[in-house]
Amino acid sequence: VLLDFFMAFIIAIVCIAPKYGMGSLNLKTTFYMGRLYFKVPFRYQTLGIYYLQLIIFAIIIVFIFIHLAMLLSLLFRNEYVAEIIASMTAVSGKVLYFSMGMGFVYPLLQKLPTTYFTIGDSLSGNLSYLMDSPGWGFNAGIIPLILTVLVIELILLVICRMKKCC
């Protein structure tokens, strides 16, 4: 997974950098914190930190999808069903958001890893705007994602030990 991201990064740099340059990773960007009546409704971080957080989220989410598909294919013995269920988990965060009343379910959604699968919304503050609540950034999203990785890996380990398939 890491090799794929590294190769995509190299290809993007080779294609874009000669024409536009590398840019400055120290450029400050603005992110919305949640509510306008806060003392500080916006925060400013560098583009380099944003890209680092984006890469970390992307690697963890791809890792979750690959291992979730492996787990589901071991359980159902059917790759087609496993991929359908894994794809449905990708959109379940948005479905819960719209079906349970927009903005009123944030205590539940903040703990679900599928909420943070929309990486740009999570990191830019758009998720804080949608939920009308602060704290939907990188620090809040990394914990459910890491816990999901650990749970999936633990279940895979238990199933593989029981079935002796790995």
Locate predicted features:
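Short hydrophobic, aromatic-rich alpha-helical segments embedded in or entering the lipid bilayer
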Residues: 104-129
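Hydrophobic, small-residue-rich membrane helices and short re-entrant helix-turn-helix hairpins
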Residues: 1-2, 166
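Transmembrane helix segments
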Residues: 76-112
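Long, contiguous hydrophobic alpha-helical segments, chiefly transmembrane helices and signal peptides
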Residues: 1, 51, 80-83, 89, ...
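Secretory targeting signals
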Residues: 2-74, 121-141
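Transmembrane helix-loop junctions in multipass membrane proteins, especially transporters and channels
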Residues: 12, 16-31, 78, 98, ...
